[in-house]
Amino acid sequence: MSPELIEEVRGVIAAYTPNECAQTASELQSIWLKAKPLESTPLIKREAREKLKAIGTPVPVLKAIGKEVGKAARKRVDDFLPLMQLLWDEYGREGRIVAATALHPMELAEPEMVIPFVRELARTSISWEDCDQLAMEALEPIVRKKPEKYLAALESWVRDENKWVQRAAVTVIGRLPMKRGEYTARCLEMIEPALGDPDRDVRRAVSFAIRMGARGDPAAVRTFIKKHSGSADPSVIWVMCDAMRSMTKKFLPQFKALLPVYERWLEVADAKSRRSIEGAIKALRK
């Protein structure tokens, strides 16, 4: 984003008061509209824009705006939460990305205030992108910084009735072992309640978490898969197969010993599950 637009954002935020949320949100929108690409630039398909109420402003621009908002908001978290709510609720995909990014420093400054707020925002996600941006920008920072204090709080999120709350938690839990390998076994245990979830968005997050666990402690992941090797639940089998099919190639050799597990699943699988299992077996045999 240009220095001129950055200065515009700073000016808008410097004048912000909680009683003027609508004006501030509108002024921020006018700034990101200036960075909107030409219609011919295929950054996001028209159908997706309509579904997400998206204009098509590039994500790096939106994140730059959000970071500037966050610099001021971290010093006045309570005052800025109404603006975050309005951006999330009323300003489409662009507003949600700006809000999620701004919440990053706000959460680090006031986690007890921001974490419950983020949970409620997650409930109203429109897409997996909303949910994942919120998880990684607005929830993950404090969990990664102080897992001994904040990780356990996500257990209830994993069991929430709302699929986006579940996905946000599983995403954050799953990413922790990337930097803190000693938490891998615990993180896998925490996502276990979502393993057989019927919703594909949740299952994809669980598969992602298993793959990220492989970066922290592959042995813990092997133990986790073996633990569920007797499951006949198609949802569980799909997750375990997707984890192998989508695993980073350099980690796959550490899971070849699990080939008999997948071969047994293939022997008893229904027709719907066979394709997933065959894909996992193919990946493990390479």
Residue ranges and their predicted role:
Residues M1-K286:
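Alpha-helical scaffold domains
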